[in-house]
Structures are given as C-alpha cells and as structure tokens.
Amino acid sequence: TGPYVLDHWDKGQQAIFKINDKYYGDKPYFTQLTLLFPEEATWLELAKSGDVDVVPVATSALNQSVDGYQFVEKSAGRAQGVSFPYQNDTGDSWNGTWKIGNNVTADKAIRQALNVGVNRQTMCDEIFSGHATPEYTSVDTRDYANPDAKVKDGDVDQAKAILKEGGWEDTDGDGIVEKDGVKASFDLYYPPDYLDRQSLATVFAEQAK
C-alpha cells in the first residue's frame, strides 16, 4: 500500500487521490493529488494557465520558460530508440494490419550499419535540446549494463563498409542500396500522440539516408 488511495477517476481526463488513512508510514504533506491526462501538445499552455503545479515539458518547449515555474530535470529511467524486426517477412500480420517480419531489417548488416552510422548525440541535441544522453543498449545506466556493448556511432564510412561487405550496394544509382533485388527501404512507425517519438523517427530516418 501507499500513502494515497484512488478517490475518483474520470477515464482519460483525471484521477483524484486522497490520503490513505491505513497507510503505515507518515502522512504525506498534500491531502489530495489530482493527476490530469492532457494531450502532449497542450502541456505548455496548461502551464501558462497556472492551473497546475507540475507539468511535463514537451520536447518542442524545452527551451521555453513559464513565469512562476522552475525547470527541474530528472532522469526518465527509460530509453527511447528504434527497434527492427529480426526475422524475414513471414507473410503473416498482427491484427490484420501490421506485417510480421521484414526482409530488409532481418539482414544483420542493415542493423549493424544503422547502429554505427547514426549519431545519437546529434539526436539528443536536435530532439531534446541537449536534455538527454545517448543510449546504446537500452540499459546503459543499469548495474547490469555491459559497457563493451557500446559502439562508436556517427561513423558513416564504417556503415557503408558494413553494407558493402554484407552484399548491399547501389547498382542503379538511385541512392538506395539493394541486395538480391531487394532495396534497403522500409517503413518506420511511431505513435502519433507522442511528439518526441515522432521527432526521433524523423531524425533517425534522415540520418539513415
């Protein structure tokens, strides 16, 4: 149990918590907590209204300030990244919509080339205005992380060498490498309600070119 219990919930709108009288520890300072669930695009305007005490900062507003609010930077405790299917196109789909497998990303050379070719620090600077640190394994900050798993990224020449060694070459001069008649082109999906993931997908795609 915790110091608060759910008192009222409006699905998709808010959740109100009150003090848990049966909590074994000290009573909290605040007698009530109200958590709102606004769209990310409205976070900044919500702060400007002065109607909330704490509000997340969208990536598009990281360099902006709001009177009466102090910017506090905390570790998110999670990593953001791009993941690829490891298996070839199975011909099946999930929920009748999403294809299972991809003939391009299933090739190890493609994944390795993208891993060393993209520049993570540039992504942190462009998307998060420097309020982020590069992540290489998704568990870099954990006690069980393996520092040897990190790679030197931003090395386009090495990425090209990996692709060539793996049999991927641009034989028709269109700027896209291919192998066995398959072009190294694929769709990259992101949830539209998360602006940071949209930005990550966009910047990643530009670097991958």
Where are these regions (language model features)?
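Extracytoplasmic/periplasmic ligand-capture domains
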Residues: 3-127, 143-175, 180-209
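Short secondary-structure junction motifs
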Residues: 30, 134-136
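Short, solvent-exposed turn/loop segments enriched in Gly/Ser/Thr/Pro and often Arg
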Residues: 127-133
